[in-house]
């Protein structure tokens, strides 16, 4: 293999509520199809995040209790390394609750979890139905209009601040 993708999965034992590990399996398979090596390293509470040692950082979603534990560790122990990694060109893929933790805060009931503040957004769980289903957005990538398809399953509502959405 001529290339390799070095991936760090943050808290995979806790942030895997809807089998988010499937995203990593899909990424590994797509790399193999293209003859690109794939290295996966799990980073959890007692582990150090080394900014120059990864090409992609991935964080999935977890139960509220698990997200609270991870949020504290991210903010108190890993924020600076995460910011340094992204500033140095490392990609960051966050889904579900992992995405919510990138914002300024995530409110669940009477509790507000601290966010990393990497995205100008706040997420609040409001009364009403969960949003569950397939979704498609339009976005411009590389100067061309593209469609991105995905699946959403969330009860929180994210309010963007001084940032633009990926698509509409």
Predicted regions located by residue number:
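N-terminal beta1-alpha1 cap of cysteine-dependent amidohydrolase-like domains
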Residues: 1-87
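Fold-independent oxyanion-binding glycine-rich loops
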Residues: 10-12, 43-45, 60-62, 95-98, ...
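Generic domain-boundary/flexible-linker signal
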Residues: 18, 51, 68, 103, ...
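A broad, low-specificity signal for short, low-complexity segments enriched in glycine/proline
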Residues: 14-22, 54-56, 96-100, 110-114, ...
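Short charge-dense sequence patches
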Residues: 27-36, 105-109, 160-166
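Amide-donor transfer/coupling interface in amidating biosynthetic enzymes
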Residues: 2-5, 124-168
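Cysteine-nucleophile active-site neighborhood
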Residues: 64-141, 145
């Amino acid at each position: 293999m001529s290339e390799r993708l070095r991936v760090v999965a943050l808290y995979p034992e806790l942030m895997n509520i809807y089998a988010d590990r499937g995203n990593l399996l899909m990424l590994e398979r797509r790399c193999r199809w293209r003859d690109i090596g794939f290295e996966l390293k799990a980073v959890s509470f007692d582990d150090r995040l080394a900014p120059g040692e990864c090409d992609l950082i991935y964080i999935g979603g977890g139960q509220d209790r698990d997200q609270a534990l991870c949020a504290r560790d991210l903010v108190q122990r890993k924020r600076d390394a995460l910011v340094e990694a992204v500033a140095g060109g490392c990609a960051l893929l966050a889904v579900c609750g992992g995405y919510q933790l990138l914002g300024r805060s995530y409110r669940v009931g009477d509790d507000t979890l601290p966010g990393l503040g990497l995205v100008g957004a706040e997420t609040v769980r409001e009364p009403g139905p969960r949003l569950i289903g397939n979704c498609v957005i339009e976005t411009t990538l590389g100067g061309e209009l593209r469609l991105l398809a995905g699946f959403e399953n969330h009860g929180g509502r994210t309010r963007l601040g001084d940032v633009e959405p990926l698509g509409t």
